[in-house]
Amino acid sequence: GVKKCACDSYYAVDMEFKNSWKSYENYLDIVNEVDKLLENCNYKNRVDIVITGGEPLLYWNNQEFQNLIKHYINKNHKLTIETNASLNIDFQEEYQKNILFSMSVKLSNSLEPLKKRVNKSTLTKILENTKESYLKFVIGNDFLENAIVEIEDILKNIPQCEVYLMPLGDSSEAIDINSEKVVNLAIKYGFKYSDRLHIRIWNNKRGV
């Protein structure tokens, strides 16, 4: 078989899965879809909106994408974009500064070249223009020492921010194997630890 690298949700980007993707004509179609989901779960509090991928910043310059972001921010939702922060973006609108960017920068074990993984210009722009954005690194037991060297290099010459370490794994068993050493590494270097609760509960089930 073919080994899938670089993206842990390759069904979101691999054309092999295109028949499972859903297209929308405009941002209001997405809003209506989300509203239906909220009605079904009978959730009465204001929800946090998380845009993930794939890579959402591929659509940063798309007006419908910006309309979607603006819609939820204007309604006082907390809006998070999960990104690897490798693409160039500019902050041209004030509402964009209210986005929380969860920046999962890839390390060398993703097998992608450095120039495609680390964009310090984008990291700096995001951290200078937003208040709560943070960096997150997903690592396993076999990459701990190398990961710290790479993380410390990434943190050089960018604004200070929170840093989270997350255990690698697409099953509860894999998370169990990696979590203890990743926790200890976070404690040692003053980082925060983020677990993968959805994987502990549902393993790698899609749509949760």
Locations of the language-model features?
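Conserved Radical SAM active-site core
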Residues: 1-97
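Conserved AdoMet/S-adenosylmethionine-binding subsite of the radical SAM
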Residues: 46, 57-208
